Amino acid sequence: MSLNEQYNQLASVVAATKYLKYKCSRSDLPADSVIMKTANRVAVQKGWHSLSTEELVKHSDDIYHRLTQDSTQEQIKCNDFNRQLRKFINEL
């Protein structure tokens, strides 16, 4: 997987986790800083490059904004993200 693909995937995981927290009422999810640190830790465990927090915040915020603008029903997004992010959420 290219560095750009890793970057996009990592930012997408962070954005979708934040979406669950703020839009799907997942109050059990930790602070954004913990989500970011965990995402970088998991990336390093996979042998990926760690991203700077600044880069990850900017890119994940852009993706989060696009997710909030997406016309897919919120319940569908919440269900999909809960299912797809189960392993990552268990790392938090």
Ranges and model annotations:
Residues 1-49:
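Short N-proximal segments of mature Sec-exported proteins
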Residues 28-92:
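Compact alpha-helical subdomains of small soluble proteins
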